[in-house]
Amino acid sequence: MCDAFVGTWKLVSSENFDDYMKEVGVGFATRKVAGMAKPNMIISVNGDLVTIRSESTFKNTEISFKLGVEFDEITADDRKVKSIITLDGGALVQVQKWDGKSTTIKRKRDGDKLVVECVMKGVTSTRVYERA
């Protein structure tokens, strides 16, 4: 089910990430540092538990979850959110909710790449990863 995502991925391109972070409410200084980071994403599966770890010079974060089960998450910019991740059409779709707001993060395979689309209101950021 999630096996296509398993592995270590390195960021190779990022479009519109600053505008997305601004829409989410991330402060200027944090946006500048986070925007320069080139994170590796490590995805693993153990039974029905999926773990996504992001490692960069900016910050390391890790979430472990079961598909379709809501969990508490502290994001890289320190937002406390409720997240739920589902598998939809071969994509891992994450919805984060906090303070009456929500954002969607869709992770999908495209050939040998992992494409992450982050959407907040009308702002979309696309980040592309390749296997490390």
Swiss-Prot record:
Motif (Nuclear localization signal): 22-32
Mutation effect (F58A): Abolishes ligand-induced translocation to the nucleus
One of the Pfam families matching this protein, by short name: Lipocalin
Modified-residue entries (Phosphoserine), positions: S13
Record keywords: Acetylation, Cytoplasm, Lipid-binding, Nucleus, Phosphoprotein, Transport
Positions that bind a fatty acid: R127, V128, Y129
Quaternary context: Monomer. Homodimer. Interacts with PPARG.
Domain notes: Forms a beta-barrel structure that accommodates the hydrophobic ligand in its interior.
Name the record gives this protein: Fatty acid-binding protein, adipocyte
Lineage summary: Eukaryota, Metazoa, Chordata, Craniata, Vertebrata
